[in-house]
Amino acid sequence: WITDAASRHPDLEVVMLLPIAPERLDPDGEWSSATRHGHWLQLRNIQRLKQELGDRFGVFTLLSRQTEQSSDDPEDIGLGARSVYVHAKAIIVDDEVAMIGSANLNGRSFSLDTETALVWREPDAVRQFRDRLWRHHLAEMLPDDFDPMRDSGLTLWNLASARNRVARTADRPGFAVALEMDWAA
């Protein structure tokens, strides 16, 4: 439905936030076949969105501002810092509607786990939620008069990512960094 909406609305932008690597549930630290399959599906859909939306689509991850000297999980490190693993799923549409929940798009969430989500359609509350969330991740990059219906949110995420990519880990004012597909492969 995102690609359909993008074809109808040429100004639509998509900012996607993902961890560097999927959560590991295997006790040996290996990816289970279900995790590998889910990761493959995720990459395939990201590639499709990138192909369909082009420069109107950005994928980002969050990195800690603490320097990671060593890790027992090197796939969880990017640019010298540990990934911030956000488990909540959220979507914000035009500051009009938002949803935050716990469900994953997999059989376990659909059949075994107890999941919940909250949807709200109060524009002022949705705008405040997006503003607080983006301000937390982008630090001072978000102008006070930002309007997602007028201004490019993706441009802000790209600028914050470029700044955080070259800054020393401890000096990053925000957490957002573009998720390179070679990190996620």
Annotate each PLM feature.
Residues 1-185:
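PLD/PLD-like phosphodiesterase catalytic module centered on the HKD motif
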